[in-house]
Amino acid sequence: LNVNTYLIKNINVIPMHKDTVLANKTIFVHNGIIKNIESKIIVDDIEIIDGKNQFISPGLIDMHTHLWDKQELGLYLANGVTTIRNLWGYSMHLRLKDKLQKNKIIGPMLFTSSPKLTSKDDFGDDKVQIETKEEAKKLVIDYKQRGFDFIKIYAGINEDIYKTIINQSKKSGISIIAHPSREIPYLDQFNSQVASLEHTEEIVQQALNYEIDSLKLPPIIQKFVDSKKSFCPTITGFYKIYEMLDKGEEVINNGAINYMNPLIKTVDSKVQYNRWANEKTNNSSITETIYKQHLFHLYILKKMNEKGVNIISGTDSGIGITVPGASIHQELSFYKEAGLSNYDALKTATINPTKTHKEFEQMGSIQKGKFANFIVTKKNPLVNLNELKKPEWIMVNGRKVDKTTLNKYSQNAKNRNNLVVTALRYLEYLLVER
């Protein structure tokens, strides 16, 4: 029997390319691809999965992650995430991608950006500082040749380097993901080579110059509409600042933090917590200020959705206290809170990413010719998105993973002790990329 070939019978299909439920269908999966969806399909000598009249929807896509180890791949699967876009890439991610593609390990489909590119005055070892246009060109060519899927540009990139990267990316045929730059007017960052702009807080902090002013929003939202740019809100990543301020040290000592990579937990989580704890000491109103900005982020999202902007769900997971996997459910709940319907919220993590990159076209919906990336739940997630938190089983690239195995992946990630290995990989990044 082919492990990636099945008939899934007696299942209710949530296709996601339209707002409907196809009751009591059979799905024929062959070599990891959906071949047919009908009321009745007969295929000889094939493994049959009884869908038990449950609900099958496309696997979730997290469009803004920071991946540190194999255990996080398991955490994503355990939460129904079958595709991730890693946005701080280096050699390790290319190796993981290769292993996933050769089925040596199981995990979500992995797409990774290059290292984060910025200009020479934007300090920090997490970024590659570019001094000359020649250097910028060479890096884009090199990243494409090495197998990175996208170029990631960062907040300190100046206009000259930005234009050089844009031009070389066009020539090299590689799209760009933009953390908007502080050095360039926000509305000038919608180049056709840019596939998506990240982070709602950058609209407030850059485009609006920290003013929570709804009257200044329309031209910004219209720019997204006119340019057909995808927008990745990362509401959860910003909200974690409020959680740190509101809940105190508890958030870096107990609970969800135990699923973070130990190097991040030891260094980044503490650094971020201390930064905001110090801010609170000096500014008693900071908690309220951050919460007000969070609510404004939800308002921005509501207005974007009303205008038909292509919103793609991304969490900023893997840094600070934003946990890989589980954060997608918090992100979707924020979209719901912002006023999106369950269907519109779920679109952001399924069908909408397919409009962002050509590499994603075979995902995001349950249709003929698409990858067999599924979540199966007892009840209908279009009635309650929380159903997605508890998959009965999932399928990734046609490989079925049952509930027991998913639970094991979560347990394997909890309080893991790979700090030294992660530190060595980070050292490799510093030596190779910088």
Please give the residue ranges for each predicted region.
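Divalent metal-coordination and catalytic microenvironments
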Residues: I11, I27, G32, N53, ...
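Acidic, glycine-enriched loop/beta-strand segments at the rims
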Residues: V13-T26, S39, V323, S341-L346, ...
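Mature N-terminal segment immediately following signal peptide/propeptide cleavage
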Residues: V3-H30, K35-N36, G51-P58
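Divalent-metal coordination cores built from histidine and acidic residues
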Residues: G51, F55-I56, L73-R182, V194-T200, ...
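Acidic/histidine-rich helix-loop elements
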Residues: L117-K133, I203-I212, T281-T289
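Active-site neighborhoods of metal-dependent hydrolases
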Residues: Q145-F150, I157, N209-F334, L430-R434
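Structural recognition of alpha->loop->beta junctions
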Residues: G147, D188-Y210, E331-D344
